[in-house]
Curated annotation (Swiss-Prot):
GO terms for biological process: glycogen biosynthetic process. Keywords: Carbohydrate metabolism, Glycogen biosynthesis, Glycogen metabolism, Glycosyltransferase, Transferase. This is 1,4-alpha-glucan branching enzyme GlgB. It holds the Pfam family GlgB_N. Residues 1-83 are annotated as: Disordered. It comes from Frankia casuarinae (strain DSM 45818 / CECT 9043 / HFP020203 / CcI3). It is an enzyme of class 2 (transferase).
Length: 812
């Protein structure tokens, strides 16, 4: 992961003079209504001077109408105005002031259509700042409204009980015909609000965020638009800004739905592709523009607006999902190719990745891809680990449906998809989650729990039900909406320990006085249990770097409930051993054998991940000592040792062909190296390792079971040799594999090892073969085991071991 302290946001402390967002150009090139001959309106470019503009007024004046740019112009009939019922439409002055200032909790109670008490009339009130006139249209009848407040509140009474109507709003440049946003009931039901309050809404994304929809009026007319809903419980007011109101939210205050903390509004005429934000009057009295926490799409960074999006994708991966639901991955081959989409090959879109990445992964025999975080993030240098939009795949490579296409293509090719997920912390960008409603909302209010000092980020308040719900639902969202097969949860250790990376006195203990984060434990258990309940065959994977017990133990037995855990200890010990000169390795032999002491305490994945090839650590190849021949040979032996060792496999992109340079997220992998036979040989080896791994059950069937592994000789430190057997549950004669790795810089002739039974054993892998760029030192394809006990086994064979090489033997 990468968690540099990045803050790209700018606090919005007041209204802009032009009513425009600070990070986007003036959108006022949209069509504008102006008078034309015959008493009708026509469309003209908003950049042209309006015939009705006041002297000195320009198209950039804030008096430009707050109306959708797509609003159709109205006809101007010659009929005289209808006579409105003689009833009062006034409001208390305080209500009007709160309404126009954006601080009213329920603008729908004042605006829209309301039956007049004591008569059969309906009062219609409209908020349209900068409008010159407002007329309510009921069929052919026209009812001019009276200005109730200089801030743009108009009102009129019309005959009948809640008739269908539309509104004609006249601005300096002409009239617009609009539908009333304030005549509709909330789009969230009582059960939705109850579940949100309880923190148990498992499909939160279906009720919050922006949703194109069609609503029906009491008279049966259909009104299309977008419903918006956001959680901001301490806000004094929330307004909607976007392309549909020229980024001037005065005309679109939202209503609060009581103690749920949800603010909601349906905007007629808005549609897919519209950019928007919430303008929030915080508890501290400061206005801020905030991106939608549940945005499904965003602008391409560094722009920060949310984008209305509705999927119309058709999935074709039903066969894969059916197979996944029947698969127990603990006893299946899992070989993961970890990839950063932006730098695998620079410049590719999701659709291009679907073609090129899928073909590459299939060709090289991997079973899964794991993508570094794809949720939207403002700073590319964070590699995706500082997320600003948890529900939106990054727009850098295309739309959400194009990301769906990538997943669908991988599935149809038989490749599973794992995505990195970051529920531990989030960035401080002022337009994103931080201090969302003017208070610590998503983050813990106490900085000793709410801030991560190493990364300069905020930490989620996992004790708050709504925050837990936001994250649990987010995990479910990626499985349900994008058909992913697994989440790798980043930085779990930072979540589990209250004193993680904190000085003495810089952290708060739990209620028992300990350092365990009980809220995080409960959250992880809930997330894992819910995912496995709803998505059979899913994977939940922990990046957990400590010895926390029971990470992959089921939740009903007190564990965290993950399916797999990265074996960080194995990775560190193995790389440390292999970074030493062979002559010194005998003194560190235990580093390679220690992993088997705890190998069955969890369900492990062996990772050579992105974290090991950045920040000056060098590439995997450059970690190996010696000259170039020795580095390549050592890397080949190490990879074979990894594939033979108990545990699922994960290899970061570029390592499969021995990239020279350490990874750089702003550059493509060093693909020209594949023209070098030495690097092509490493690629061939990885391809063959994956092929053998998928076809030899002994290599994967009992990864988490002691019955699947036994040492031949764990103690040959003098020769730097490790030999062991892998077993499957099949007939012993065909269900065993002998793996011997020589990490010495010299070969060994006449090296005797014990084997479980006599007979011919085929050499099915030799990393020193010519095919892989080696010297072809080996055993001519097979060895003969004789009935001479050795190493506590009934038979033995004499081998030739290549320098810095590994061989695998299988009964013939």
């Amino acid at each position: 992961m990468n968690n540099g302290d990045v803050n790209n946001g700018t606090a919005r402390t007041g209204r802009l003079a032009t009513g425009l967002a600070p990070d986007r150009p003036n959108p006022r090139g949209a069509a504008t209504a102006v008078r034309n001959g015959g008493g009708r309106v026509a469309l003209a470019d908003r950049d042209a001077s309006s015939a009705s503009a006041q002297p000195g007024q320009t198209a950039d004046d804030p008096a430009v109408p707050s109306a959708p740019p797509s609003a159709p112009p109205s006809a101007l009939p010659a009929d005289p105005p209808a006579v409105a019922p003689a009833v009062s439409v006034d409001l208390p002055y305080d209500d009007l002031e709160r309404l126009v200032s954006g601080a009213h909790h329920d603008p729908h109670a004042l605006l829209g259509a309301h039956p007049h008490p004591g008569s059969d009339a309906t009062v219609v009130r409209v908020l349209r700042p900068d409008a010159r006139a407002v007329t309510v249209l009921v069929g052919p009848a026209r009812y001019p409204a009276t200005r109730l407040h200089s801030g743009g509140v108009f009102g009129v009474a019309v005959p009948g009980m809640l008739p269908d109507y539309r509104i004609e709003v006249t601005y300096p440049d002409g009239p617009y015909l609009i539908d009333d946003p304030y005549r509709h009931l909330p789009t969230l039901g009582e059960m939705d609000l109850h579940l949100i309050i309880e923190g148990r809404h498992e499909q939160l994304w279906k009720v919050l965020g922006a949703h194109p929809r069609a609503l029906t009026t009491p008279g049966g007319a259909t009104v299309t638009g977008v419903s918006f809903a956001v959680w901001a419980p301490s806000a004094r007011g929330v307004r909607l800004v976007g392309d549909f109101d020229f980024w001037d939210g005065r005309a679109f205050p939202m209503r609060s739905l009581g103690r749920s903390g949800i603010w909601e509004l349906f905007v007629p005429g808005a549609g897919t592709g519209a950019r928007y934000k919430y303008e929030i009057l915080g508890f501290d009295g400061i206005w801020r523009q905030k991106a939608d926490p549940l945005a499904f799409h965003t602008e391409v960074p560094p722009a920060t607006a949310s984008v209305v999006f509705a999927s119309d994708f058709t999935w074709n991966d039903g066969a894969w999902l059916d197979r996944r639901a029947r698969t127990a991955w603990r006893t299946e081959p899992v070989s993961v190719y970890e990839v950063h989409l932006g730098s695998w090959r620079r410049g590719l879109s999701y659709r291009e990745l679907a073609e090129e990445l899928t073909a590459y992964v299939v060709e090289n025999g991997f079973t899964h891809v794991e993508m570094l975080p794809v949720a939207e993030h403002p700073f590319g240098g964070s590699w995706g680990y500082q997320v600003s939009a948890y529900y939106a795949p990054t727009a850098r490579f295309g739309s959400p449906d194009e990301f769906r296409h990538l997943v669908d293509t991988l599935h149809r090719a038989g490749i599973g998809v794992i995505v990195d997920w970051v529920p531990a912390h989030f960035p401080r960008d002022t337009w994103a989650l931080g201090r969302f409603d003017g208070t610590p909302l998503y983050e813990h209010p106490d900085p000793r729990r709410g801030e991560q000092p190493d990364w300069g980020t905020y930490v989620f308040d996992l004790g708050r039900p709504e925050v837990r719900n936001f994250l649990v639902a987010n995990a479910l969202y990626w499985f349900e909406e994008f058909h992913i097969d697994g989440l790798r949860v980043d930085a779990v250790a930072s979540m589990l320990y209250l004193d993680y990376s904190r000085p003495e006195g810089g952290w708060l203990p739990n209620i028992h006085g300990g350092r365990e984060n009980l809220d995080a434990v409960s959250f992880l258990q809930e997330t894992n249990a819910t995912v496995y309940r709803r998505f059979p065959g899913a994977m939940m994977i922990a990046e957990e770097s400590t010895a926390w017990p029971g990470v992959t133990r089921p939740t009903h037995l007190g564990g965290l409930g993950f399916g797999f855990k990265w074996n960080m200890g194995w990775m560190h010990d193995t790389l440390d051993y292999n970074s030493r000169l062979p002559i010194h390795r005998m003194y560190h032999h235990h580093q390679m054998t220690f992993s088997m002491v705890y190998a069955y305490s969890e369900n492990f994945i062996l990772p050579f991940s992105h974290d090991e090839v950045v920040h000056g650590k060098g590439s995997l190849l450059r970690k190996m000592p010696g000259d170039r021949w020795a580095q390549l040979a050592n890397l080949r032996a190490l990879l074979a040792y990894m594939w033979a060792h108990p545990g699922k496999k994960l290899l970061f992109m570029g390592c499969e062909f021995a990239q020279d340079n350490e990874w750089n997220e702003s550059a493509s992998l060093e693909w020209p190296l594949l023209d070098d036979p030495a690097h092509a040989g490493v690629a061939d080896l990885v391809r063959d390792l994956n092929g053998l791994y998928r076809t030899v059950p002994a290599l994967y069937q009992h990864d988490a079971d002691p019955a699947g592994f036994s040492w031949i000789d764990a103690n040959d430190a003098e020769n730097n040799v490790f030999s062991f057997l892998r077993w499957s549950g099949e007939d012993p004669a065909g269900g065993v594999l002998a793996c011997v790795t020589n990490f010495a810089g010299i070969g060994h002739e006449g090296y005797r090892i014990g084997l479980p039974f006599p007979g011919r054993w085929r050499e099915i892998l030799n990393t020193d073969g010519y095919r892989y760029g080696g010297g072809n030192i080996g055993n001519l394809g097979s060895v003969q085991a004789v009935e001479e006990p050795h190493h506590g086994l009934d038979a033995s064979a004499t081998l030739t071991l290549p320098p810095l090489g590994a061989i695998w033997l299988s009964p013939a």
